[in-house]
């Protein structure tokens, strides 16, 4: 962030050194290649690939589809949601909307579900039960319906689920200051519940003035609610 007063000469601080960024060239990155190798050898069952935005989940699904040829059906909340996947899949994409797929008798060796967290869990459960192998991809970042409940509820109920995570950004360089600023602004970093609470519990009333007097407190509360899969939305921040 740069603060410039009109009466002063602009002074631009030196940016911290960051690794060079190179746009994706269609070939799998290191993390993608390692996961792709395991998915190709996946025994009958369900695999899930989760990551923050811009890490190449949909691209990975498209690469898998290209290798599978015509042995897979792709579904997603909307046809437009698989545009990235389709760009990596080549001519092998066979897409069906979730409800249409459920009503049909279509069969395939694989089912690939992009943005799986946006599909109602009962419908998703029926779909995955019909195919020998299923790949689910979703983000775990953001508000209700974008992934956190998918991890806490749906994935936790699947026996022998194989989980994979992509951490290296592909759409932008590692350490991108804009990504960090947006994550902080929209409170994307949920409470991970890594440490058990210690000591006695204290009940305390919280009001809107906390944003001015104790800004860390309402932010921590929001992270707690989001991590616990409460129905969070942007409006809560100003409630």
Model regions: which residues?
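Conserved helicase/translocase motor-coupling segment
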Residues: 203-239
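Hydrophobic positions on the alpha1 helix immediately C-terminal to the Walker A/P-loop
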Residues: 60, 64
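Signature of the SF2 helicase/ATPase Hel1-core->accessory helical subdomain module
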Residues: 122-161
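Conserved coupling/interface region of RecA-like P-loop/ASCE motor cores
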Residues: 1-25, 155-194
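Conserved RecA-like ASCE ATPase "motif II neighborhood" in helicase/translocase motors
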Residues: 91-129
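Conserved RecA-like ASCE P-loop NTPase motor core of nucleic-acid helicases/translocases
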Residues: 50, 70-82
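Conserved lysine of the Walker
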Residues: 57
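N-terminal pre-P-loop "Q-motif" helix
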Residues: 23-43
């Amino acid at each position: 962030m740069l603060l410039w007063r009109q009466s002063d000469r602009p002074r631009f601080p030196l940016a911290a050194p960051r690794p060079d960024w190179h746009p994706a060239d269609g070939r799998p990155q290191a993390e993608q290649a390692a996961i792709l190798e395991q998915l190709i050898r996946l025994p009958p069952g369900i695999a899930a690939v989760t990551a923050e935005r811009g890490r190449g989940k949909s691209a990975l699904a498209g690469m898998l589809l290209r290798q599978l040829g015509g042995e897979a059906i792709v579904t997603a909340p909307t046809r437009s949601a698989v545009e990235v996947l389709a760009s990596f899949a080549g001519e092998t994409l066979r897409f069906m909307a979730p409800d249409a797929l459920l009503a049909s008798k279509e069969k395939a060796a694989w089912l690939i579900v992009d943005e799986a967290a946006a599909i109602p869990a009962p419908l998703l459960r029926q779909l995955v039960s019909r195919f020998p192998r299923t790949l689910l991809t979703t983000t775990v970042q953001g508000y209700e319906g974008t992934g956190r409940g998918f991890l806490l509820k749906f994935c936790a109920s699947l026996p022998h689920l194989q989980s994979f995570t992509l951490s290296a950004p592909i759409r932008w360089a590692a350490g991108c200051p804009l990504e960090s600023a947006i994550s902080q602004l929209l409170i994307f970093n949920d409470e991970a519940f890594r440490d058990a609470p210690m000591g006695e519990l204290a009940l305390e009333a919280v009001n809107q003035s906390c944003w001015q007097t104790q800004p860390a407190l309402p932010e921590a509360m929001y992270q707690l609610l989001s991590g616990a899969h409460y129905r969070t939305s942007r409006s809560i921040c100003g409630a």
